[in-house]
A protein has these predicted regions:
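Active-site SXXK
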Residues: 101-121, 129
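Glycine/charged-rich beta-loop-alpha catalytic/anionic-binding loops adjacent to active sites
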Residues: 90-99, 122, 165-166
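Buried hydrophobic packing segments
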Residues: 112-116, 141, 183-190
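C-terminal motif of bacterial Sec signal peptides marking the signal peptidase cleavage site
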Residues: 21-25
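Short alpha-helical patches at coil-to-helix transitions and adjacent helical residues
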Residues: 105-110, 135-138, 177-184
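N-terminal export and membrane-targeting signals
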Residues: 1-16
Length: 302
């Protein structure tokens, strides 16, 4: 049907263009110079191509959103959770379900570790904070950023702002807020973020206990965070990272997912997180093959 509508649009545009030319010929004794006519035709063709391209991109985005909705509904129904997903690619960003308004928990350790690497943090401390999600190591990195810059909160916020992925960073950093959409945007940027190389490598080497959801997928680096809300008693488990594709030029797509459920057990949320991650990965792989998702070349650059 998309090709039929495109053909109809092209036909209508050409008919209108032809009629306009015919009317112009009747009203004027002298026709337009041949060069002007060719130029006008070229401009009309370019404008029409732009309209068709925009319409195709919009249709791809709507179709992707609908498919994400179906993935989310299946996971929610089967596991009794609420879920959210964000995808960031060259072709655009899509966010469905939960927006990620809950605390960031340990996902915020990624930009903290990058900010710490920028001021010379010990790589073993970074490994502990990312690979094992060690809270004491993360606090040591935060303290070093505070000592070196005088404002750890501002340093981490500035880093995220630089890559158009802002968060509300709190001194009790686990309670920061960072939407899934912005996490996916930062994830897509990770391969090119200054001073992020060691952090990026650590995200591919998580301990077995944390190697689930996005982290368990092939060609994907991610960091998770989880915790119990003191406000509504709901347990949130969220992850963000980057999915890369191999080829002549590496390509990347930023991903962020979240499940929220009653209870307080990490293991209870894990099956839902795994199912959500696999569903999203399958969808993204197919959308890339179909051209509905166009990854960033190497990484997302601002």
């Amino acid at each position: 049907m998309k090709h039929v509508r495109s053909f109809q649009l092209i036909t209508s545009a050409l008919v209108i263009f032809g009629l306009s030319g015919a009317v112009g010929g009747c009203d004027n004794v002298q026709s337009a110079p041949e060069g002007d006519a060719q130029s006008q035709a070229a401009q009309s063709t370019e404008a029409l191509a732009g309209v068709l391209k925009d319409r195709s991109a919009e249709e791809d985005s709507l179709r992707l959103a609908g498919e994400l909705d179906r993935v989310i509904r299946r996971v929610e129904k089967r596991y009794g959770v609420e879920a959210g997903v964000a995808i960031d690619a060259q072709s655009g960003s899509v966010q469905r379900g939960l927006k990620g308004e809950e605390p960031t928990w340990s996902t915020i350790k990624v930009p903290i570790a990058i900010a710490a690497a920028e001021v010379g943090a010990d790589e073993q401390m970074i490994d502990l904070a990312i690979e094992q999600s060690d809270n004491d190591a993360a606090y040591a990195l935060w303290t070093q950023v505070q000592w070196e810059t005088g404002d750890a909160n501002g340093a981490v916020s500035d880093l995220l702002d630089e890559y158009d992925a802002p968060a509300k960073v709190e001194d009790s950093f686990g309670y920061s807020t960072w939407t899934l959409k912005n996490q996916a945007a930062f994830g897509a940027s990770l391969p090119c973020v200054a001073h992020a190389r060691h952090v990026y490598d650590a995200m591919a080497n998580l301990i077995v206990y944390h190697d689930n959801g996005l982290s368990a997928l092939p060609d994907t680096r991610a960091k998770g965070g989880w915790g119990l809300s003191e406000i509504d008693g709901m347990y949130a488990h969220r992850q963000f990272g980057v999915r890369t594709t191999k080829g002549a030029e590496p390509q990347s797509v930023g991903l962020a997912i979240e499940v929220v459920m009653p209870g307080d057990d990490f293991s209870d949320a894990e099956p839902a997180l795994n199912a959500l991650a696999k569903g999203v990965d399958k969808l993204v792989e197919q959308a890339i093959a179909d051209g509905a998702i166009k990854p960033y070349v190497a990484c997302r650059r601002i």
